[in-house]
Amino acid sequence: MAGHDVQYGKHRTRRSFSRIKEVLDLPNLIEIQTDSFKAFLDHGLKEVFEDVLPISNFTDTMELEFVGYEIKEPKYTLEEARIHDASYSAPIFVTFRLINKETGEIKTQEVFFGDFPIMTEMGTFIINGGERIIVSQLVRSPGVYFNDKVDKNGKVGYGSTVIPNRGAWLELESDSKDITYTRIDRTRKIPFTTLVRALGFSGDDEIFDIFGDSELVRNTVEKDIHKNPMDSRTDEALKEIYERLRPGEPKTAESSRSLLVARFFDPRRYDLAAVGRYKINKKLNVKTRLLNQTIAEPLVDPETGEILVEAGTIMTRSVIESIESHLDGDLNKIVYIPNDAAVVTEPVVLQKFKVVAPTDPDRVVTIIGNANPDDKVRTVTPADILAEMSYFLNLAEGLGRVDDIDHLGNRRIRAVGELLANQVRLGLSRMERNVRERMSVQDNEVLTPQQIINIRPVTAAVKEFFGSSQLSQFMDQHNPLSELSHKRRLSALGPGGLTRDRAGYEVRDVHYTHYGRMCPIETPEGPNIGLINNLSSYGHLNKYGFVQTPYRKVDRETGVVTNEIVWLTADEEDEYTVAQANSRLNEDGTFAEKIVMGRHQGVNQEYPANIVDYMDVSPKQVVAVATACIPFLENDDSNRALMGANMQRQAVPLINPQAPYVGTGMEYQAAHDSGAAVIAQYNGKVTYADADKVEVRREDGSLDVYHIQKFRRSNSGTAYNQRTLVKVGDVVEKGDFIADGPSMENGEMALGQNPIVAYMTWEGYNFEDAVIMSERLVKDDVYTSVHLEEYESETRDTKLGPEEITREIPNVGEDALKDLDEMGIIRIGAEVKEGDILVGKVTPKGEKDLSAEERLLHAIFGDKSREVRDTSLRVPHGADGVVRDVKIFTRVNGDELQSGVNMLVRVYIAQKRKIKVGDKMAGRHGNKGVVSRIVPVEDMPYLPDGTPVDIMLNPLGVPSRMNIGQVMELHLGMAARTLGIHIATPVFDGASSEDLWSTVKEAGMDSDAKTILYDGRTGEPFDNRVSVGVMYMIKLHHMVDDKLHARSVGPYSTVTQQPLGGKAQFGGQRFGEMEVWALEAYGASNVLQEILTYKSDDINGRLKAYEAITKGKPIPKPGVPESFRVLVKELQSLGLDMRVLDEDDQEVELRDLDEGMDEDVIHVDDLEKAREKAAQEAKAAFEAEEAEKATKAEATEEAAEQE
């Protein structure tokens, strides 16, 4: 037997064909969401408060300090928030201290700071009753970047940019004359020496002393001449910078100083963030810059005077490691003192080394490091600016390297916590202005923190982020896999990111650093391709937001691949050589071959085993979760694999799902971490279990109650239904499945079914990827799904009185009310079809709705018969089904409703949809198709043992698309069905062709895995042997029921009077420009005429045509289309007197907008009608009065008798 058995959870064993021992379990797949939010609550929020506070008033006599915060219990539970359309949020209370510096008085107070949305255990947020996800954003990391560009003469120039988290950009660039310029915040350029002089190093000698002698420096110094001898060089430089930043304003050295301090050195205006400081220190650090350079002067320990490195030594990695502590310490540190006129007058500490120029052995080049400022320094420092300039000048000498902006070492991820922190910071900085003003205006004696703090800017910023940010998305809840994928999605779009139109090819392309960090396969097709990605299965964020991936460390001494796991970011990985996970190992853990496949800085080739530093932990670490669910992925073309991964996310949950016979072993983990199943939180024993709840007695005696959700509507309108897996008496451990979620079976993801599939044509019905299906799949509910739709009706107060929910609806027969209760609301369990009443509702009729005769009646008899009109909620087109649930919310019951709403009724209708012609089906290899025919079971081809085939696919769908994985799955699936086993064939480490054929042989199938098929209609065998097997097929969300649409009489557009378009508007088919050409080509004048008139916007014509058809009369000639009248009116509005004449030169009257407005005219027959009506009403009133008198008399008589 090939393969070995592996247990997945407690309910499933699979025969696995993997050969590689997994040394690391998959991390929790939604930790990118949960960990980030937890970090935000633990310290992120505190940091934001500490960034903005303390706040002082303008005279610096009062100060508001932040003390701490506390998050209380949420107002609603998760379920209540869902039902009431509320947000699942917790109140946050912040303690502030207000200090009066004049009197020394301190007031401490706790201030309510709004309700903060709380993340659920599943990594989602409930906002206004809907489940949402905050997608992580992929952005350019703050730091310093160097780039090269070739001008039109083929000369290489360099550029550099310091990009902060917030604040001004600082750029350097060289031109064709080898002069170096700098730009501050995208303004006009100035020689870089001007900025150096402004920093307090004004003499040319000082500049040469700092940077050394290079052509770029010489040329720039020559260009930067002293123009105004009245000013010092520093003052002149400051004025020149001010002129660039604030053109047209009077320039003084003082204003320039304060402007530059505000732009670069004020932590409130300029922020590199921790990640920016880390990146700058890493880039400008002398250790990386000295690597493999020849040192030009001896390095001497400043404390002992010992020579650490002799001149002429090549600084290899081992040499640098040997003096690392000195390099991080005071080795070659030089302190420069700026002059008194400088922007910043503190001493500038630099590290300075001289190396031999790589391009010219006779020249010496100076390398300046920024002496590694502390992590807490969040602004750029003069040392950073000088070190950046040094790196820039070194590039021209062949030292250092330019950066690749698409490298994942230069792109980081902003997860939920950081995005939220940014919003709170935004709100707090808006609040800050407000607080300052209130502090200054009000009386200091009586001020308390509560009085000066207005929380509205903060709550508004948070609310806006959750409600309308591009990154706050309605959760994709088609099935558990789509939920999981959505939580792990990385988007380069959104505020502060890219835009679709400006994103070029390079940003979207697969980069070698994506390996193990971002999936190279799973990305949408269409305009977002490459901009929206998915985290790879083992991907993990470090504290700076860079994606790390795990590797096994290789001991270079012994050559043993250890089980020690090291997590590396993309730029750390660049320094090492990494072997692939499928490299063969000996028993002792050394490499079996002398030469192994590996990669170094994106070069995939064979490397000697003795230079390998790390090895991949798993073959599936390259791909995302959805991609890792495709068996035989390695045999599929990447474009089809992309479609396969994306289509699994569109699978509809079926009523009795089956896990695949041929899986990858990823199904269990995906189902477990998706959040759609019920998972045991603690060890214990089941004491009670039914369909709605499970009780587990913990080992310490306490009781856990798990509620099972039944047929809840998901965001996608599918049924979110959980099924209990445990029985009373079962022992459960933490992490075990208590109930399956939708699209799960026995704790494994189960998106579809395992039908028997044959690759053969049949009467041409599977032309162009169409799918032929057996009626068995319809009858046995194999591909049946339940869909729930929510409809709501609300009663409001109108000017004419309140609307009412009632059974008494005007002009509706008793038959239409048979399923309504006494309130007029449909009963649960009623079968409804389109047009049926769900909620009976009447609205008072307005004056404007009264006809002339009714108004006359009001005038004659006073305000008697105020009518109501029927505004009931009815079942829309194509939404028939069974009423699953009704929820009623009223103010009386204390439900929170919108203002003006008195009562809200929600009705849920469930539809059971069997598979039908027009539904879309797919396999896991991008092989999608539409059901074209459902054939009776008896007519389907059958196997020699009499088993009829379930599905027939076209064999032509395989060769050109190169997704051969489906054929291998087919054969292995048939073997698994015959042997009665489930199989796991992990990606890139699955069943080889030898495993496949040996399993086929074990199952007793023929050696070519094909079979003879018999025609179900004639019983004759088909001419050729056919590939028949079991393939996992899923039903996709694109169902014909949602798309089928027909219009009879429907709504028209107000202006053009043409029918609306689209199913949602109950619109018609657009007969467009090209279709008109087709009719013109045939000369079909009458058809054209009616399309342009009766069927479109000839208002009178269409009414008359309808009348003529119903009465069987000939159809009258059409009139003028409304859109023509619109054109005439537009031309008239331009002052052109345009009229329409007929063939006799008589003016054609166009419908006027005022027509039908003259409602005050009362015609004679109207009076007659009114008289009749009045007489009838008077008669009815008289009869009613008489009847009332009679009953009163009877009652009096009875009373007398009793006495």
Swiss-Prot record:
Positions of region (Disordered): 1174-1203
Residue stretches in coiled coil: none
One GO molecular-function entry: DNA-directed RNA polymerase activity
Source taxon at top rank: Bacteria
One Pfam family named in its UniProt record: RNA_pol_Rpb2_6
Keyword annotations of the record: DNA-directed RNA polymerase, Nucleotidyltransferase, Transcription, Transferase
Reactions it catalyzes: RNA(n) + a ribonucleoside 5'-triphosphate = RNA(n+1) + diphosphate
Transmembrane feature ranges: none
Enzyme Commission number(s): 2.7.7.6
Ranges of Basic and acidic residues composition bias in the record: 1174-1195
Subunit annotation: The RNAP catalytic core consists of 2 alpha, 1 beta, 1 beta' and 1 omega subunit. When a sigma factor is associated with the core the holoenzyme is formed, which can initiate transcription.
This protein's name: DNA-directed RNA polymerase subunit beta
Species name: Streptococcus pneumoniae serotype 19F (strain G54)
